[in-house]
Amino acid sequence: MQDPRHPQGLPLSPGLPKRQRQDRTIYNWKQQEVLENHFKEEQYPDYDTRQELAEMLNLREYQVQVWFKNRRAKRSRERWFQKQLQQLQKHPQQQHPQQQHPQQQLQQQQPQQQPQQQQPQQQPQQQQPQQQQLHQQPQ
């Protein structure tokens, strides 16, 4: 049996109902402003506070809970990036090996060698006349 919701014809699981995913919640600017202000004061609101916010903003408690969870994750990411930026500003020459160009990594891994001075080689064209002179017999 084919699932009519999937034009590719994915088969249905027999006997088990499909779990419906809730649509993404889009918060208007007023909801965001209120939630952000509460987040500044309390990053982990309890159930009663979330319930009050949900009623005030015409949302479900679960949506408020998810908003706070996502906002804490965003704060964590921002702190991590800020820390990375501060480290780069303190030590601009020191980069994490994965942040370097592969050529830079190779240069750092190889021991520093002094380039050997090579003596210029005579070109074959210059040697040919000398060889011809040696092989020629005087007349």
UniProtKB/Swiss-Prot annotation:
Disulfide bonds: none annotated. Belongs to the paired homeobox family. GO terms for molecular function: DNA binding; DNA-binding transcription factor activity, RNA polymerase II-specific. PANTHER family: HOMEOBOX PROTEIN (PTHR45793), TETRAPEPTIDE REPEAT HOMEOBOX 1 (PTHR45793:SF12). Residues 20-79 bind DNA. GO terms for cellular component: nucleoplasm; nucleus. It comes from Homo sapiens (Human). Gene3D superfamilies: Homeodomain-like. One of its GO terms (biological process) is maternal-to-zygotic transition of gene expression. Residues 82-139 have a biased composition (Low complexity). Residues 1-22, 78-139 are annotated as: Disordered. It holds the Pfam family Homeodomain. It is found in: Nucleus. CDD domains: homeodomain (cd00086). This is Tetra-peptide repeat homeobox-like protein. Keywords: Developmental protein, DNA-binding, Homeobox, Nucleus, Transcription, Transcription regulation. Transcription factor required for zygotic genome activation (ZGA), a critical event in early embryonic development during which the developmental control passes from maternally provided mRNAs to the expression of the zygotic genome after fertilization. Protein produced from maternal transcripts that binds and activates expression of key ZGA marker genes, such as NANOGNB, ZSCAN4, DUXB, KLF5 and DPPA3. Binds to regulatory DNA sequences containing a 5'-TAATCC-3' sequence motif.
